[in-house]
Amino acid sequence: MEGFFWKTWLVVAAFAIGGTSSLPHKPLTYEEAVDLAVSTYNGKSGEESLYRLLEAVPPPKWDPLSESNQELNLTIKETVCLVAEERSLEECDFQDDGAVMGCTGYFFFGESPPVLVLTCEPLGEDEEQNQEEEEEEEKEEDEKDQPRRVKRFKKFFMKLKKSVKKRVMKFFKKPMVIGVTFPF
């Protein structure tokens, strides 16, 4: 009987010293992390339309109990719903020509409170530029009967136009970086 008392006392003391949980946050599954990243983008990006998950690439080892940094990669697409409507994402269909964003998120669980840093940038712009360049080359071939100086003049302005357009697009299409803390 006396041995049972000391064993029980030892177990109670071990729990009191160690605590019931050594994690500073509740476990976060991969699906919850992706949902949190999408809702963070919708809430902090300043976009008029809501974005919904298009694809998520699960990492080989997502540990919901980890205190170290965790990375996730996802693709989101613009929907027909506006942010101001405050509708559920399940009710929102994708826009046919909606913007597609490639996002990388980093969860820093070692911080108190935990931190999410989300970086998103537009996808698919290179295809549009290549299509425009092909159309311009076709126009140039059709205009081969023009005098030489007209051709040079047009070629110069086409290069100038491409350069200006490229710089403007690069300036306005910088990746969006969002950093937030979230309580658990």
From Swiss-Prot:
Intrachain disulfide bonds: 81-92, 103-120
InterPro entries noted in UniProt: Cathelicidin-like, Cystatin_sf
Acidic residues biased stretches: 125-144
Keywords: Antibiotic, Antimicrobial, Cleavage on pair of basic residues, Cytolysis, Disulfide bond, Hemolysis, Membrane, Secreted, Signal, Target cell membrane, Target membrane
Signal peptide (from-to): 1-22
Tissues/organs with expression: Expressed by the venom gland.
GO biological process annotation, one example: defense response to bacterium
Pfam families reported in the protein's UniProt record: Cathelicidins
Region named Disordered: 125-147
Taxonomic superkingdom: Eukaryota
One GO CC term, this protein: extracellular space
Propeptide: 23-150
UniProt subcellular location: Secreted; Target cell membrane
Reported function: Potent antimicrobial peptide against Gram-negative (MIC=2 ug/ml against E.coli ATCC 25922, MIC=8 ug/ml against P.aeruginosa) and Gram-positive bacteria (MIC=32 ug/ml against E.faecalis, MIC=32 ug/ml against S.aureus). Adopts an amphipathic alpha helical conformation, that may allow to partition into the target membrane. High hemolytic activities have been observed on mammalian cells.
Family note: Belongs to the cathelicidin family.
Miscellaneous remark of the record: The putative mature sequence has been predicted by AMPA, a predictive algorithm for identification of peptide stretches with antimicrobial properties.
Xref: PANTHER family: CATHELICIDIN, NEUTROPHILIC GRANULE PROTEIN
Protein name per the record: Cathelicidin-related peptide Pt_CRAMP1
Organism expressing this protein natively: Pseudonaja textilis (Eastern brown snake)
